[in-house]
């Protein structure tokens, strides 16, 4: 069948052949030169860039012609389809060889050690942005070392493209030099810089790409989104006033597009159910089908698979497989019924009248011996070995017990008809009618109907019991939107794990503080006022290559905060100010994972809290700043987190003994008085005492201690008493203000311990005071630095102005630098190690060596670790028992929140944590 995208013809040749100079001077240089300080009559950076692009396109149409595709291959290098196999380090080494740069020279060191410690230690000694920009640095070195010529040669766009096409075929360094050296010797230095940028396949237009497409033709970006083909996008029409029909803008088989994505759960189950049950008006035929299927107040519940999101395209006997990130895996899974790891089994998988179809699903690796779906990382090797197996008679591949298994959950196109605008229940009905499942090779993903929060709870328990990834809940009427749209009618739900904080948050970079290792400040956008509020700072987990990528993508966009602060209508910082700030529209997205939320951040960040022990998982180039977590979403996440902290942190849901009870009073009466240290003092103890390591001394334990040393315990304050009154607390409570208004000081529990330790009643000093209206009376008891004359205090007490989080920042940045204290790597985390063989004992020792806690109860730990050396069948049976018990005893409240559960991880999780000196995502080390 012929489709619109198959029938696009190149426009007539241009009147004039465009030069490379035209692109660099009229587009690249001008866009790169846009600064907030030089906007002129334009209100924003984006507005000025839009004007530059419009002017360039008008100039091109008027003076050059309608065939912009050859030029677009240079304007959009990352979309040109050319791969040069030249990364930054390889390019730097190529330049050394090309210009015979001596080993001891400054230029040699700059290029040879581009990604090594030389750059990290030296990069801020001169203009930082220049030394981090390889194209700029390389062009500067080339300008000094290339032969001097009387007149530079002007290259045309076809000439540059021809050279780059040759380069894409050349794998030998000398051949690459022969192609590139004439260009480097004869282009102007600014052109050399942009050519290097193109060689590295880096985006030039960045956030203005969509605008460029739509300026060329109003349907431009939509066409690009349905095919991701630069040539077809820029050649489908020479008349921007001639719009395409909706049928032409529909998806086409064998043309790649980004699939629809799901949102994460941000509300209670009860609210979510109401949202998923929401009904929209439909045409009579669909309404009739809706009622026939009994879908009133129902929603779909599907298992979230641990695989590779994949779109299967079938057109006649031809197949295409495209991943979520548009990578073509057809060579692996098959392009025909004859060959391929999957397609060779699909000859009878479709109904006889199916000519063309697009299916959305998840590609997983299935182990037929163990009858389990394997972790995501095993998928590619399984597919490769399955593909090779069909071409060999050698039985070396017979040991491979896994192969690709495609689970389909949606149909988007059928026999020339785009189905994305049809309701999901209609699409699923079609899907079940046209497919003939091949067991454990090609099946429709099981879908069940739910109608209440109890249905979600049951499904979550099953997920926990089977150690699966989670659920996806879908509105039965939901439509499908391509291009990576996150549909609010598709919600992913995952079990909550026994980490203090297990969310991966996509955050916008808004600031930077240069150091040996850059740290990037991220912010949250408020949907109410559009302002970005500073939230956290991250440096861990970013590889040198990623640091370089961030610097490339944001080059020239940074503004020094000591020169110009951002307007408060755009960005709000707390007391922690980065060295540079960047406009969010010029920035990028980082995926950040943290161990906990630190609510003690105070005014350091504008949000009022921050992420503790965070690290960057990756740069999210596939996400725009508008797809990140908002301030309001984070507020909800934080509320759930704090609520979880207030609950028992185990799946057992044990009830704590009430603080005040008749039984407690009777126990207190039985305490024997052994000293008169506190005689004449009445104690009202209002809070527990919590140590930095998490150890808690309860109110009842302190009461017993006070009574043991002769103190009197009271439950309220009587101002007429003859006793001295001591109100003990280290928490702000609703009644605190009442006592302060009566002139009563609030004293920390540590005072009780210090008195007992020294055997005398100590005077009250600032160190012991939690809150008071009489601070002046205490300040004279310490020296000018706040240090007591009689009591030794640690540094964080001598400098009480610094919060714990600020002290932690100072320790990390000053005391340790890059040599972080590995000994505290697992501090605050508990592990249950399966087995008791030699391997398990060694593993336990390693965990304890890095300050991890070993738990005797698997339900109460953060991570259940399976050592490498074990009997797999025995271990699987044991783990299945654990999973079932965790599922049974998991507590789910009425709001859909649940007690947290442990991760099942392999020994590699512990080893990787120690190697990287931070806690990686346990999903990457899941045990199956």
Curated annotation (Swiss-Prot):
SMART domains: BRCT. It is found in: Nucleus. The active site is at residue 304. Its cofactor is Mg(2+). It is an enzyme of class 6 (ligase). Mg(2+) 2 binds at residue 469. GO terms for molecular function: ATP binding; DNA binding; DNA ligase (ATP) activity; DNA ligase activity; metal ion binding. ATP binds at residues 302, 304, 309, 362, 409, 469, 474, 492, 494. It comes from the Eukaryota. GO terms for cellular component: DNA ligase IV complex. Its EC number is 6.5.1.1. It catalyses: ATP + (deoxyribonucleotide)n-3'-hydroxyl + 5'-phospho-(deoxyribonucleotide)m = (deoxyribonucleotide)n+m + AMP + diphosphate. CDD domains: Adenylation_DNA_ligase_IV (cd07903), BRCT_DNA_ligase_IV_rpt1 (cd17722), OBF_DNA_ligase_IV (cd07968). Coiled coil: none annotated. This is DNA ligase 4. The gene is LIG4.
């Amino acid at each position: 069948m012929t489709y619109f995208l198959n029938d696009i013809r190149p426009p007539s040749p241009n009147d004039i052949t465009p030069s490379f100079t035209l692109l660099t001077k009229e587009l690249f240089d001008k866009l790169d030169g846009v600064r907030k300080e030089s906007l002129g009559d334009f209100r924003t950076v984006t507005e000025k860039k839009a004007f530059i692009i419009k002017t360039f396109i008008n100039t091109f149409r008027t003076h050059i012609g309608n065939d912009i595709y050859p030029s677009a291959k240079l304007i959009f290098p990352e979309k040109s389809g050319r791969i040069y196999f030249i990364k930054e380090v390889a390019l730097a080494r190529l330049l050394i060889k090309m210009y015979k740069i001596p080993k001891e020279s400054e230029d040699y060191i700059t290029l040879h050690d581009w990604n090594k410690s030389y750059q990290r230690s030296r990069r801020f000694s001169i203009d930082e942005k220049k030394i981090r920009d390889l194209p700029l640095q390389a062009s500067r070195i080339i300008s000094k070392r290339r032969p001097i010529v009387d007149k530079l040669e002007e290259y045309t766009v076809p000439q540059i493209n021809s050279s780059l096409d040759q380069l894409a075929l050349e794998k030998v360094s000398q051949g690459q030099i022969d192609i590139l050296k004439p260009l480097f010797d004869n282009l102007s230095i600014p052109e050399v810089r942009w050519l290097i940028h193109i060689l590295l396949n880096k985006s030039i237009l960045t956030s203005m790409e969509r605008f460029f497409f739509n300026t060329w033709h109003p349907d431009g970006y939509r066409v690009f989104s349905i095919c991701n083909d630069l040539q077809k996008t820029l050649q489908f029409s020479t008349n921007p006033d001639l719009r395409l029909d909706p049928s032409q803008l529909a998806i086409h088989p064998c043309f790649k597009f980004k699939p629809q994505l799901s949102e994460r759960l941000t509300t209670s189950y009860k609210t979510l159910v109401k949202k998923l049950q929401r009904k929209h008006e439909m045409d009579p035929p669909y309404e009739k089908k809706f009622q026939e299927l009994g879908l009133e107040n129902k929603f779909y519940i599907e298992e979230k698979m641990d695989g590779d999101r994949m779109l299967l395209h079938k057109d006649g006997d031809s197949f295409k497989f495209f991943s979520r990130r548009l990578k073509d895996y057809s060579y692996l899974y098959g392009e025909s019924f004859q060959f391929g790891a999957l397609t060779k089994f699909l000859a009878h998988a479709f109904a006889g009248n199916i000519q063309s179809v697009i299916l959305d699903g998840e590609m997983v690796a299935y182990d037929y011996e163990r009858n389990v779906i394997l972790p995501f990382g095993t998928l590619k090797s399984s597919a490769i070995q399955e593909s090779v197996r069909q071409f060999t008679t050698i039985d070396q591949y017979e040991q491979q017990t896994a192969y690709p298994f495609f689970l389909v959950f949606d149909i988007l196109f059928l026999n020339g008809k785009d189905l994305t605008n049809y309701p999901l229940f209609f699409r699923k009905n079609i899907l079940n009618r046209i497919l003939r499942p091949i067991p454990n090779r090609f099946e429709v993903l099981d879908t069940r109907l739910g109608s209440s929060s109890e249905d979600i709870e049951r499904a979550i328990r099953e997920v926990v019991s089977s150690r699966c990834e989670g659920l996806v809940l879908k509105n039965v009427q939901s439509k499908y939107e391509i291009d990576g749209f996150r549909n609010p009618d598709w919600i992913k739900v995952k079990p909550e794990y026994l980490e203090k904080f297990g969310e991966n948050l996509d955050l916008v970079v808004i600031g930077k503080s240069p150091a040996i290792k850059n740290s990037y400040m991220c912010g949250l956008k408020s949907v109410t006022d559009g302002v970005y509020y500073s939230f956290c700072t991250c440096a861990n987990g970013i590889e040198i290559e990623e640091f370089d990528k961030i610097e490339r993508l944001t080059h020239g966009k940074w503004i020094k905060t000591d020169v110009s602060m951002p307007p408060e209508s755009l960005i709000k910082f707390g007391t922690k100010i980065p060295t540079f700030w960047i406009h969010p529209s010029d920035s990028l997205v980082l995926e950040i994972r943290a161990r906990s939320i630190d609510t003690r951040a105070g005014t350091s960040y504008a949000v009022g809290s921050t992420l503790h022990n965070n690290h960057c998982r990756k740069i999210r180039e596939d996400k725009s700043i508008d797809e990140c977590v908002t301030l309001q979403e984070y507020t909800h996440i934080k509320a759930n987190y704090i609520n979880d902290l207030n609950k028992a942190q185990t799946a057992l849901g044990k009830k704590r003994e009430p603080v005040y009870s008749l039984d407690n009073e009777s126990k207190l009466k039985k305490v024997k008085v052994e000293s008169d240290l506190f005689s004449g003092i009445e104690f009202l103890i209002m809070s527990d005492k919590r140590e930095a390591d998490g150890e808690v001394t309860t109110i009842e334990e302190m009461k017993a201690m006070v009574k043991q040393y002769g103190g009197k315990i009271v439950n309220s304050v009587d101002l007429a008493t003859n006793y001295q009154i001591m109100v003990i607390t280290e928490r702000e409570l609703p009644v605190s203000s009442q006592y302060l208004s009566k002139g009563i000081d609030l004293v920390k529990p540590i005072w009780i311990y210090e008195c007992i330790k020294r055997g005398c009643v100590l005077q009250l000093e600032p160190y012991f005071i939690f809150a008071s209206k009489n601070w002046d009376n205490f300040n004279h008891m310490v020296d000018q630095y706040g240090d007591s004359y009689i009591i030794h205090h640690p540094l964080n007490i001598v400098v009480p102005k610094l919060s714990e989080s600020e002290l932690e920042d100072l320790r990390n940045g000053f005391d340790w630098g890059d040599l972080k204290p590995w000994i505290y790597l697992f501090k605050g985390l508990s592990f249950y190690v399966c087995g008791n063989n030699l391997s398990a004992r060694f593993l336990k020792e390693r965990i304890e060596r890095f300050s991890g806690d070993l738990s005797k109860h698997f339900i109460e730990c953060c991570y259940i670790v399976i050592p490498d050396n074990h009997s797999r069948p025995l271990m699987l049976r044991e783990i299945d028992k654990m999973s079932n018990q965790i599922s049974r005893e998991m507590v789910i409240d009425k709001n859909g929140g649940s007690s947290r559960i442990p991760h099942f991880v392999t020994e590699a999780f512990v080893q990787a944590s120690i190697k990287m000196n931070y806690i990686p995502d346990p999903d990457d080390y899941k045990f199956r």
